[in-house]
Structure formats: C-alpha cells, structure tokens
C-alpha cells in the first residue's frame, strides 16, 4: 500500500541502541521538541513513510536494511538513506553548517565557500526525494523539514507533479542582501517555489523569503494580510512585522506562505517538573544556594547564541555592583558541539576562556561566580535548573525561535521567575512580557540584568502568567495541526489562511 503521508527529516524518529550484540529502537530521550508530535501524526496516517539519513561504514553497507517497520506500528515505514562518513561530513558538517548556517543567521563573515560541496548536497537531496517518492501515492502529502533539504521539493515535484509539498523552515530566513550571498541562491529559491506551502516561524522570515524570491524570479504577490496581533508583536521590537504575505504566484503555481512558530509540550514539561524526583532536585539546588539569586543560561555552543556577550555582561555586573559578589550565581549550560563540527571550536574556546577569567577575578573561598557545564545535561537535570533559577538569561545574537525560553516559562508555570530574552530570538515576538534586550548593545544588556534582579515578585508572576498562557495556547500539537490543516487545503485557490 502506498503512503499518503511522507515526512522528510534529517534525524531518525528513534534512538538505535546496541546491547549484548542486539539492536533496540527506543524513543528519543527528551519529552519535548517536535519529534513526539511528528511521530503521532506519522502513526495516525493510514500509511506513512519517514525518510532520514543513516551514517554507515563500508562493512555495514552489505547488510544494511534501508526500510524498517516503525516499532509497534505496522502501517509506518522508516526509509533510511545510507551515507558514508565523507558524505555526512560534506553534506552536514561543512556545506550545511559552514556555508548555509552563517548566512541563515546573518553572519556572512563566517560563510565558507571553498570547502562546500554543492554537488554532494544536491545528490543527497535527490536521494531523499527518490526515497520519499518510492512508496508514496501520486497525491501524497510530503512534509519536508529544514534547510538541509532545500532542494528536495524540486526533485519531488519532478517525480510527483500532483503531490502536495509542504516545507517548514526551522531556522531564521535572512534579509535579501544576506541570503543572496549564496552562490546557489537561484536553485534554492526555485525549489522552494515548487512547494504548495512554505512555513516559517515568524512573519519577518516570510517577508524576507518573499523579498529574496522577488529579487531572483518574477513572482506575483497574490495575497497579503495584517499580522495576527494575538499571536505576534506587530510593531516595536527588532523582529516585528505588521503585514505578512500569505500567497505567491509563480509560473501559474500558487505557493502559500504562513508563519507558525514551533511550540513546546507544556503538559509533558509540567508533569516532569512536578515529579517528586525533579522537585527534590530543585530543592537541593535551592538549599545549596541559600538566599543567592540563580541565573541560568542554557544552549548549545554556537557563535550565534551570544554566550560570549552574556558572559562579558555578567563580568561588568560584578564590576559595577560589587555588593552582588557572593550573592548571585550564574550557571552556564553550554554543551559542546558534536565531533566533526569544527566551526564551533573557536566559540567553545572563547566561552571557556571567559569563564576562567571571570572566576579567576572574582571567586572567593566559598563562592564561584560561574558554574559551566560543557557536557550535555540530561533533560531532567536541565528541568531542575529551570525550576530553581530565578532568572533565565537567553540572549542569542540571532535565533530562529529558541525553545529554551519557552521551556523555562513552562517550568515555572504562573509562579515567579524572570526571562531575559534577546530581541533577535524569534520567540521574542511571541513573548512580549519577557525583558527584551539587545545583545549588541552593552548598556541595554546591563539595564536588562539590573531590571531582572530588581523585579518585584508580583510583577514576575504577572509576566510569567501571561507568557505561560501564550505558550499553552500555541503548543507543539497546535503547530503540527496548523501545518497539516493548511497543507491539505492548499489546492483551494484563494483560500484564506487560518489564524495562528
């Protein structure tokens, strides 16, 4: 039986574990993120296929099983594309992370062209399309995820002209002058214009894509509407946008556009936070700190995350306000990037250097200003810090959304706590009750941490309640529902978009 739904995602939907010479497949350990939600839609389809890549060695190639039944679900198939270590390196570690990533995040000086392997990237995207089409109905819905698979819609459209193709962009989409630095810009845009629906986190990213498309191709804007101000801040902050283009026409093909940011899973997060083991973890952290304020910064090592700027601001805080020495503690959870990700090595070294300098300058016999974790914390450990932290300091220089900010709010519910959030994180236009700051401006950063430390409990609770309610209204399930609803309706000419 052919699949009516095909999900294309660079990760497999489970963890493969070897124990005692046997292979087991287990759910991803984090209860949050989009994976559980995608899997629920995947399982509920009459017949579905999930396409991902799998790195294998030459020895494994001979006995490699490309198609596997989804554990416990006979109607679902995982189609794994075997890639060699060199293919993965060139496709993911170099071309995706050293060429595309810096452009998407508006860091053009980090862009690498010479080592990029465009032909390898094209080949792997075509392999994804071939695998996706192999078992798909002629009118199947293909849901393609993220920039790693930019070219896949084009190859699918060649093979399945009547298919519905939806694409969701999980990163920022930059301004036209930045995106057009990419030497392969025309091929990327041509592929995205093959889609029936292109989804982005924010109206700003939609408008940036429209500007790029109009700069390279003769596209017609066929529908533009005011931004839904119940969902997004329309004016007054860095990523605000008052209007959104919701449909383009190119060569008699309609491309629907929409903004619907990924949500969290508040129910699961709250259940985990309220577990006795998590509450005990929170209690122990608070007991160890005493009356000290706990500030938390969490995120992987990446030059776009603004960790360096945050650390320098913390150093200024201890200089400006010496009375806070021994009264505040900063926990930095900055997990090292996976091996092979050479682009992040300098960022890691800079973080470690700054933490060493600050601790060396200000540490007392009974107080260390910063506790740095460079190994990944378990989700349970991270939730313990979320629950214990008085302040979450999330100030990326650029971020498509930033789910950590939402997770911190959910961990606190309607209780006290303060979120400092960069204006350049996509979630800032969803969470106006955070303390929004500009990580490029030292004075604004100083003012934001001072405001957070001084905020009365009543104001903390009011702001947190407002943010928590917003996150509850548009959780990860609503995000996926929205995507499927809009994708299935794309064939209706002139259809009005459903509000977020």
Curated annotation (Swiss-Prot):
Induction remark: By salt shock.
Enzyme Commission number: 2.4.1.213
Reactions performed catalytically: ADP-alpha-D-glucose + sn-glycerol 3-phosphate = 2-O-(alpha-D-glucopyranosyl)-sn-glycerol 3-phosphate + ADP + H(+)
Pathway: Glycan metabolism; glucosylglycerol biosynthesis
Pfam families, alphabetized: Glyco_transf_20 (PF00982)
GO MF term (any one): glucosylglycerol-phosphate synthase activity
A Gene Ontology BP annotation from the UniProt entry: glucosylglycerol biosynthetic process
Protein's job: Involved in salt tolerance by producing GG-phosphate from ADP-glucose and glycerol-3-phosphate (G3P), an intermediate in the synthesis of the osmolyte glucosylglycerol (GG).
Family: Belongs to the glycosyltransferase 20 family.
Matches recorded under PANTHER family: BCDNA.GH08860 (PTHR10788:SF106), TREHALOSE-6-PHOSPHATE SYNTHASE (PTHR10788)
UniProt name for this protein: Glucosylglycerol-phosphate synthase
Upper classification of the organism: Bacteria, Bacillati, Cyanobacteriota, Cyanophyceae, Oscillatoriophycideae
């Amino acid at each position: 039986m052919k699949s009516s739904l095909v999900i294309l995602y660079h990760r497999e939907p489970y963890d493969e574990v070897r124990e005692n010479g046997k292979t087991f497949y287990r759910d991803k350990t984090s209860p949050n993120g989009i994976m559980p939600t995608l899997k629920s839609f995947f399982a509920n389809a009459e017949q579905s296929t999930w396409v991902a890549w799998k790195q294998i060695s030459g020895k494994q190639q001979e006995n490699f099983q490309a198609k596997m039944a989804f554990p416990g679900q006979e109607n679902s198939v995982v189609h794994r594309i075997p890639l060699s270590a060199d293919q993965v390196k060139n496709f993911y570690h170099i071309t995706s992370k050293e060429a595309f990533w810096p452009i998407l995040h508006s860091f053009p000086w980090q862009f690498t062209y010479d080592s990029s392997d465009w032909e390898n990237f094209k080949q792997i995207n075509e392999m994804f399309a071939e695998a996706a089409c192999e078992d798909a109905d002629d009118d199947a819905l293909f849901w393609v995820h993220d920039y790693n698979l930019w070219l896949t819609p084009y190859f699918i459209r060649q093979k399945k002209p009547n298919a519905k193709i939806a694409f969701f962009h999980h990163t920022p989409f930059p301004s036209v002058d930045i995106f057009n630095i990419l030497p392969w810009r025309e091929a990327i845009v041509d592929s995205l214009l093959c889609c029936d629906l292109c989804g982005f986190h924010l109206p700003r990213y939609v408008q940036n894509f429209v500007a790029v498309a109009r700069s390279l191709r003769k596209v017609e804007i066929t529908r533009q509407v005011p931004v839904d101000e119940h969902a997004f801040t329309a004016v007054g902050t860095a990523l605000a946008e008052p209007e959104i283009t919701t449909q383009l026409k190119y060569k008699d093909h309609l491309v629907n556009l929409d903004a619907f940011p990924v949500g969290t899973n508040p129910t699961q997060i709250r259940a985990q936070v309220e577990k006795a083991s998590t509450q005990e973890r929170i209690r122990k952290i608070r007991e160890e700190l005493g009356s000290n304020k706990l500030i938390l910064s969490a995120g992987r090592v990446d030059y776009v995350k603004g960790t360096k700027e945050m650390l320098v601001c913390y150093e200024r805080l201890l200089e400006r306000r010496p009375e806070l020495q021994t009264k505040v503690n900063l926990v930095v959870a900055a997990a090292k990037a996976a091996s092979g990700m050479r682009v992040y090595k300098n960022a890691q070294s800079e973080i470690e250097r700054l933490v060493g300098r600050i601790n060396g300058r200000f540490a007392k016999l009974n107080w260390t200003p910063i506790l740095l974790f460079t190994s990944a914390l378990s989700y349970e450990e991270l939730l313990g810090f979320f629950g214990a932290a008085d302040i979450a300091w999330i100030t990326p220089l650029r971020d498509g959304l930033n789910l950590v900010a939402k997770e911190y709010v959910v961990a606190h519910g309607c209780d006290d706590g303060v979120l400092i959030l960069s204006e350049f994180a996509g979630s800032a236009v969803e969470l106006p009750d955070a303390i929004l700051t500009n990580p490029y401006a030292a004075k604004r950063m100083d003012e934001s941490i001072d405001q957070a430390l001084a905020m009365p409990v009543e104001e903390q609770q009011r702001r947190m309640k407002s943010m928590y309610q917003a996150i509850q209204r548009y959780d990860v399930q609503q995000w996926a529902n929205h995507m499927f609803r809009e994708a299935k309706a794309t064939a209706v000419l002139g259809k009005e978009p459903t509000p977020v």
